[in-house]
Structures are given as structure tokens and as C-alpha cells.
Amino acid sequence: MPGKWISALLLLQISCCFRSVKCGKVLVWPMEFSHWMNIKIILDELVQRGHEVTVLRPSAYYVLDPKKSPGLKFETFPTSVSKDNLENFFIKFVDVWTYEMPRDTCLSYSPLLQNMIDEFSDYFLSLCKDVVSNKELMTKLQESKFDVLLSDPVASCGELIAELLQIPFLYSIRFSPGYQIEKSSGRFLLPPSYVPVILSGLGGQMTFIERIKNMICMLYFDFWFQMFNDKKWDSFYSEYLGRPTTLVETMGQAEMWLIRSNWDLEFPHPTLPNVDYVGGLHCKPAKPLPKDMEEFVQSSGDHGVVVFSLGSMVSNMTEEKANAIAWALAQIPQKVLWKFDGKTPATLGHNTRVYKWLPQNDLLGHPKTKAFVTHGGANGVYEAIYHGIPMIGIPLFGEQHDNIAHMVAKGAAVALNIRTMSKSDVLNALEEVIENPFYKKNAIWLSTIHHDQPMKPLDRAVFWIEFVMRHKRAKHLRPLGHNLTWYQYHSLDVIGFLLSCVATTIVLSVKCLLFIYRFFVKKENKMKNE
């Protein structure tokens, strides 16, 4: 009987594969950390549907572990960048952004951000050179005849590999600083009058002063900030493609952009047909908790529990700050499950248990969970939205400030500043979110609209990948704006022509009037003289 069931399941999988698209070959150029965790969800689903997925893995990557992904194939290639160097860079990157970077305006943090991004760009340029100069690997990839490439544009190079292999490619991205990649390479439409620029930390309904700040941010990211060292990348891409080109032009060839966000987190703005918002694709129903954890949760009674996690990349919280947080947690009647990897705080209460790892999604989906203290990472925020849990946000770096600002604007969170918050601030925020039904009501509303979609985010992401494999491209969805120069795109040539026409008309009209005036004046003077 089991053998029959296995055969039936295999037959069903094969039939599903043929119904949607022939079982294809997908090549992946990934990014590390949460970027990899998100894209891996898509890859696992592709494997479930019968596709063959191969991941290009730089040997310097240390989070992306092939042993934890048995269904995927990996091509690990040697790199000139060491694993220790890359790890130390990312740790420094997070620490500087969390504790040193000014947050007043975009201009206040711009020099520090640009320095970090320049170093980031150099690392990935080295990784890109390592992979495309590896003739043995590139020959193997060429012979494998992949159907499509899936890439994270924050880690540039996927588009170059796709061009060299002559296959279509798609992007999976949460954001780039200031939406620079999205605007320059994707031609995204993001009016600064009502769309907050990412990394501005602004919410949806902006005041006049906030719109000024937003405009300054947009101008900075559009005209001064460089996500990648353009000259280096442009020269490198031109050399390997054998023709003059630019990084922006090459990235602009993407068939589809899969944005790891959605309208329950974002604010409405214009979008394009080759862009789909698939935020929350990793979310799923909660599973049962481990026995000892379930017993602790149940012991909370009617008060319920609070889940506390500031992510996996921050482990250097000061002892003073940890004690302030622990003291505040000890004052509430709820039981607390705290993901914390450090010295146990002296003020830790009897109601609080510290764990090095938490089944976060399963806890957020537990009926006794009352609130979620989070750093505001997109994954955690979406899990809270999925399960309808209000948040206390303590953003640390990246777009976390923006995520929490959006949740505050939507009435599902309260924000704290990790640099300035006191123990009383933490306690007041906890009591406000737990006791005020306003936050729970809005969290449930966000959860409701997240679930009320015609197609699950993960299914949409996979659909578009299979769509590109079926049709070999999706050029009919790609805006023609990609074929225009920057001045044509903004109609500056048309505006200049029309202004010149108006100016010419005005000049000719004035000259005609002057001629007529002089003619009649001369005629009148002549008549008087006679």
C-alpha cells in the first residue's frame, strides 16, 4: 500500500509539472543572510514542483549551508575573498549601522553609508570576477542549458552570468538603498510627494516638513549615492560581454521583479506589469511547540506570553541595555520568551526565559501570544502580520526603521529607539501594546487582508518563474522606458523642443510687432514732414 501511495504522489507531481511547465532547470545567484532564507523558500517550492535547481555558492559564504538544503544542487566555487573577511565585514556593517550611524536626515548618515556600501560593492565585484573567470565552471554551466536564472540584485553579478549563458533572468529583492536599483534599472514609479523613500524612516501620511525630508532623501539617492562603483562595474561588464554597456543597462534586462513586500506593509503607489509584490511568501501556519516550551506558555494562564527577538545578527547588546530590557520584562504579568545570546542579565525576572533559538513563527501563531518585540526585520514583521500579532519595534539597521514606521502608521506597533530607550520606555511600550485593544484590532485587520488574496505570495513567485521558462521571456511586460535615455525618459528633449518653439514664437511675434510699429511710426513721421 505505501508503495502505491508513493507511485501516486510521484505521478501527481509529474502531471502537475507538465500541466504548468516542463520540468525546467533553474540557476540561482543568491545573497547571504535573510536574503538567502527568503529565496530558499522559492527554491524549495520549485523543487517540489519537479524543477532542477542549482545554486552558485561562493566559498566565502558562511550562512548559506548546502547541508541544510538537500533538495538543491550547489556549485561552490573558490573566491579571492576569505570567509573570515566577509563575515567580519558584515558584522562591522551591522554594528556601525546600528550604533554609530546618525539618523536625523539622509544627509547626516550619507558619508558613513556610502563608505560601507563602497566596501560592500568591492567585495561582490571580487566574487563576480571569481565566478565568471572560472572557465571550467562557466563551461559546465553553459553545457547544463539552464532555462532561467533567479538572482538577488543587491548582490550584483547574476545578470552578467545570465547574459553570458544567454538565458532570461528574474530578480527577487526586498529593497535597495533609496530604491536606487529599482528606479534606475527597473524604472519603478515612486513619487516622493507621497511615497516614503526607503531608509528615510518615514511613514505614509507625511507632513510638509516630512515631505521636504523625503525629497532631500530622494535627491541624495538619485544623484549622489552609488549602490555600486559604476565605473568599475561598467568597465568589468563591458569587458566580459565584449561590447560597451553599463551595470544599469544589464540589470534593466530583467524579465520580472519579485518584491519581497506587499500592500499590508507598504503604502500604495504606482507599479509596473513586470513587478509583483510577494511579501510574506515564507509565512505558514504555526506548528506545535516543543513540550517544555508549550508547558511554559500554558503556565501563563489568561495573561498570555510576549515573544522577544531582535534577530540573529545582533549579539553585542551592552550589559546595561540588556538589564534595562530584562527589568521591564519582569514587571509585566505575561510570561516572556526572549531570544538572547549573551550574558544572562542580572535583572532577569522569574516570568522570563532566555533561549538561543526560538521557533518564532510557531510562537507568533500560538493563541496565547499577546505581543511581539522585534527589531523590525521584514521576515519577523510579516510573520506578525500573518498571525495578527501587534508589535513593539526596536529597529537596528537597514530598512527595519522603515518597516516599524509603516507598522506604527498602520496602528499595529509602537516604536522604541535602542540608543535612547530607558527601562521605563520599554515597560510603557509593552503595557500600551498589550493593554490597548487598538493595536490588536489593527494587527488582525492586516492579517485579514494578507490572507485575503486570490493567490498565495509563494505561488505567485513560482508562477512568474515558470511563466518565464514557458515563454523564454516576458518582454511584453517590460516597459519601453528601458529603451530610452535618461533625458528621453523624463521627456526633457520634448520639453526643450516645446520651450524652444514657444520661445521662437514669442521672439518672432515681438519682432513682427516691432517691425509693424516702426513701419507705422516712420510712415506717420513722413506724413508730418510732408
Swiss-Prot record:
Glycans are attached at residues 316, 483. GO terms for cellular component: endoplasmic reticulum membrane; mitochondrial inner membrane. The keyword DNA repair does not apply. One of its GO terms (molecular function) is glucuronosyltransferase activity. The chain crosses the membrane at residues 494-510. The keyword Ubl conjugation does not apply. It is an enzyme of class 2 (transferase). It is found in: Endoplasmic reticulum membrane. Its EC number is 2.4.1.17. It is a single-pass membrane protein. It catalyses: glucuronate acceptor + UDP-alpha-D-glucuronate = acceptor beta-D-glucuronoside + UDP + H(+); 17alpha-estradiol + UDP-alpha-D-glucuronate = 17alpha-estradiol 3-O-(beta-D-glucuronate) + UDP + H(+); 17alpha-estradiol + UDP-alpha-D-glucuronate = 17alpha-estradiol 17-O-(beta-D-glucuronate) + UDP + H(+); 17beta-estradiol + UDP-alpha-D-glucuronate = 17beta-estradiol 17-O-(beta-D-glucuronate) + UDP + H(+). Belongs to the UDP-glycosyltransferase family. UDP-glucuronosyltransferase (UGT) that catalyzes phase II biotransformation reactions in which lipophilic substrates are conjugated with glucuronic acid to increase the metabolite's water solubility, thereby facilitating excretion into either the urine or bile. Catalyzes the glucuronidation of endogenous steroid hormones such as androgens (epitestosterone, androsterone) and estrogens (estradiol, epiestradiol). This is UDP-glucuronosyltransferase 2B17. The lineage of its organism: Eukaryota, Metazoa, Chordata, Craniata, Vertebrata. The gene is Ugt2b17.
